[in-house]
Amino acid sequence: MQKEDLQCIQNHPGQRAAGTRLTLIMTRDDRSRTLETFIQTLEDHWPALIVERTRADDDGPPLLSLGDGLGFQGLPENTKLSPFLDILAGEVPRPPEEHRAILNRMALGEELRLYVAAHCPHCPKAFRQWAALALAGPNLRVRVVDGSLFPEEAAREGVQAVPTLVMNGDWRWSGNIPVNDVLRQLADRDPSQLSAAALEGLVKEGRASKLADAMQAHGSIFPAFIDLLTHAKW
């Protein structure tokens, strides 16, 4: 860990806030050890932090879970560290009423992926903004992906600049991301068109009952749910 990052941790006003928690989800991916080393250092200098460690038996990427609907896939260092620590300490701004109203209209939300990178001057603002929305909206899920540590994922999704927000692998917004447009598109979309990957994410996060309610309200089983049930993995 860089000296500047260590000082940022030691000087953060929320360092001793009670009830500060995060979950480290490790996998067979070698980068799990990189995240584990960072978290161990963070624990050593953040006395009130409680870390739950779990291990997923797959080759997927390791993840830091910061609360319902919000995950950080990468190393929260450099420009990413300050917003990460603010979120840990519960210092998250309340989204505007207009945004909260749209969040409340969402039935099921597909996971948005926000790509950031070290030394990106505009990434901290996007990180804070979308973290606040994910934590405020029970049906909005955001995964912040460190493109520096996971370049293969950024390349696969055609990310050429940061910050970039990706929805459903097709829609993407870079730079100054239009929050209203993205939220409205999520709220107004047909939930029956969610992908199998999105439905799997809901089930893994303990939201199977919400998925069942959505299908009941729709009056039919979502096509991708059949694909999920018949997948060889299950």
For each feature predicted by the language model, list its residue ranges.
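N-terminal leader/targeting and pre-domain segments
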Residues: 1-19, 75-108, 191-197
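Local sequence-structure signature of Cys/Sec-based thiol-disulfide redox active-site neighborhoods
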Residues: 2-40, 103-140, 223
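Catalytic cores of nucleotide-enabled group-transfer and carboxylate-activating enzymes in metabolic
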Residues: 13, 19, 62, 91-94, ...
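N-terminal non-catalytic structural scaffold regions of very large proteins
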Residues: 31-79, 93
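Non-catalytic, surface beta->alpha helical segment in thiol-disulfide oxidoreductase systems
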Residues: 65-94, 166-200
